[in-house]
Amino acid sequence: MNHPVAVALSDFSSLFLQAWRDTGHGFPRSEDLVGLESPCVEHDSGDEVTWKPITRQPQGDLAGVEKGIEIELHKDIIDFYSTQFSGDMAAKFGEIELDLLQVFSEQDGVRLQENILGHLVTQRRLKLKPTVFIGVIDSADKVIAICNLTGEVILETLGKNERDVLAKDVASFLQQLVPVVREA
């Protein structure tokens, strides 16, 4: 796990966990994850799940996406989604509040790959540069994404060629995130 993205993601995950501890909540909690199996689940009460990010061993891959659309994904995209299991993590990047998307389990990884593949197929059809989403904001038509060509992290308007560069790469984006604690 010495790739800069894996290190930055692990560092942010540690900050996220510490933010939850500092507010007296212990582990992050979610009602949305109840009943889902994952190696990062600490406890499932039936009403809410407590979880913590854990290193994924062995590291996953996104070969299904690459094969499905016949494209080589940027290494940062692969490392972002394949080095740990975690629930989504709330964060702020400057004034932008977002949920950093994560892979919760192997089954969730399959679903994620299907969603990424659909996103890339739509972009190809619309003749847009390929991106892969890594975060969602409180807007139905915008996502935080990684440009597959440059590795830049961008704020992208879905279905349009409107993109604002947020960071030159994923590691520097992750290093600028501030954890946000949202109670379930």
Curated annotation (Swiss-Prot):
It is found in: Cell inner membrane. CDD domains: Syd. Gene3D superfamilies: Syd protein. One of its GO terms (cellular component) is cytoplasmic side of plasma membrane. InterPro entries: Syd, Syd_sf. Keywords: Cell inner membrane, Cell membrane, Membrane. It is a peripheral membrane protein. The keyword Membrane applies. Interacts with the SecY protein in vivo. May bind preferentially to an uncomplexed state of SecY, thus functioning either as a chelating agent for excess SecY in the cell or as a regulatory factor that negatively controls the translocase function. HAMAP family: Syd (MF_01104). Belongs to the Syd family. This is Protein Syd. It comes from Photobacterium profundum (strain SS9).
